[in-house]
Amino acid sequence: MIRFPNAKINLWLRIVARRPDGYHNIETVFYPIQLQDALEIVPTSQQETELSLSGIVIDGDPQNNLVMKAWRRLSCRFSLPPISIYLHKAIPFGAGLGGGSSDAAFLLAMVRDYFRLPLSDDELDKEAASLGADCPFFLHNKPLLAKGIGDEFEPIELSLKSYRIVLVKPSVSVPTSVAYSLVTPVLPEEPVRDTVSRPVEEWRGRLINDFEESVFARFPEIGEIKDRLYEQGAVYASMSGSGSSVFALFDKEVDLADCYPGCFVWTGICEV
């Protein structure tokens, strides 16, 4: 069985409150894009489940990969036999794109289907939430408004069909803990539902990522990418999550693959 975990972008991100437990309450809109990893599970004669990695190099012990944590959740709960897992990484990490969370969520869904587990969609959501606040989003893969610590989801009317999207990630990565330590919570002046209901051409200056000011000050090359995307005709551009990737929406076809040497560049079409 093979499936293709996709990335997401944050169309906006507001830090609205600091919580007593040290976390932050946020408001953000998750939007799925078609930048994808490849994930395969197959039977094995081995005594233990193994994860094989290819593509973008991921540092650290594969046993600590979120995919393996997802596997252990279900294998322990249902006493499952070992499998072999193959993960080809194409989604950059440390980019605010949710690649690791997507891999884990897809693995949960694949294991449920492969072994025909008696697991409802709601139960699968709970298993995903135990792995990461944004993991359940990838089980639904449609635009959602996220609140709380990013784990409370509400449907939102939004369509970006036919827009072109360009994603640029510089070589620098922004640690999430560092990004949060630099921001001050601020309540948005306009409800997000009102803002995203406006034409995309009106989003600039209205949809805000609260991480940008402090992250751009510390990593000016990220801010320069956003400015350049606007100069190249973007209708809307923003950093995704806590960075370091920047995405831009265009109302026409563009080819910017050679415009950002040393950066990861991906171009696609918005499908929802």
Identify the meaning behind each predicted range.
Residues 86-115, 133, 235-247:
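Glycine/serine-rich anion-binding loops at beta->alpha junctions
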Residues 49, 140-141, 145-236, 251-261, ...:
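Conserved, helical-rich catalytic subdomain that frames metal- and/or nucleotide-binding sites
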Residues 32, 129-130, 136-139, 156-161, ...:
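Solvent-exposed alpha-helices and their adjacent loops that cap or buttress functional pockets
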Residues 1-95, 113, 117-122, 157-160, ...:
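ATP-binding N-lobe of GHMP and related small-molecule kinases
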Residues 46-60, 107, 129, 199-208:
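Short, basic/glycine-rich phosphate-binding loops at helix/coil junctions
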